[in-house]
Amino acid sequence: MIRRIAGAPGPVGSGSGGDRPGRRGTVRYLKDEAVPSAPRMLLGHALRSRRHHLGLKQEEVARRMGCSSSKLSRIESGMHHFKEKDLLRLFVVYEISGEKEQAVLLELAEIANQPTWWQEWSTVAQPYLQAVISFEDMATRIKAYSSDLLHGLAQTPAYAEALIRRGRGERDTHDALLGLRKERRARFEAAPGKKLIIVVHAAALLNRVGSPEIMADQMEHLAGLSERRNHQLRLVDPAHHYDLPVELGTTTIFDFEGRVPKVAYAENLDGCLFIQDEDLVDHREVVFDELRFKGLGPDAARRKLNDLARMYRKFQAP
């Protein structure tokens, strides 16, 4: 278990590797490029925040470290293998003397350097998907808003298969991705203390994936999830509320219970955003919570889902 990092991060300026400056972090737009795993990204973010808090330039730190600026840039971007000796030097340069904070950063580095359980799927899973899985692994609470398609952790195997089969790639690739999805779900369910909070727009329930039978089973599956202790489900139905901030778009917020700052993930057809700028993450969470509080409660949501399941059953061939 990773403990809390002592002290709040300072303001962060410009980075590298496609990062843009944020008020207190970075925003990465990603498509096909390599993506650091959660511990690498979080450790790099913590180090970069500390450097900017002290007002140090990369060139100055690199000189004091006896390394190149490009190496330091890769460390801060999470794209470099973390070595304990490098971290210990950075502790001196960045005046990180607290034992607890050092222990957190060293533990992040240790986790970052370990082989991942999804390594066997690395040739078929897109880099950003692997990063998402690493954040799911680390997060204690996951908040997900689904505006058009259901979140991967909420999908039935049949829904997931129909969705994956209509995507790019050969059948063997699809089979491998289905195996990854199954393992991903199993690990989430087996992990103690995790919670998934899902807000689903009504449109996502009407966007048909696969057959009417698949959709009916999916509606019943969602109704069942809403009764589990490690899940919370809310439905956003414009027919019941006006002026809903649905422009949030498909978004997932990873919460680490204060051990490290929250991270938001937003996706679209061509790429995705990993958002570490804490002001932007906070704003997305405020909007998410507004949707959650305005959404249908558990009982009303289950009634809606069961009604939709019956509707889809009527479309099935006799």
Walk through the language-model features, giving the residues of each.
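Interdomain hinge/linker segments and adjacent boundary elements that couple functional modules
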Residues: 2-3, 9-45, 53, 58-63, ...
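C-terminal regulatory/effector modules of DNA-binding transcriptional regulators
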Residues: 192, 211-318
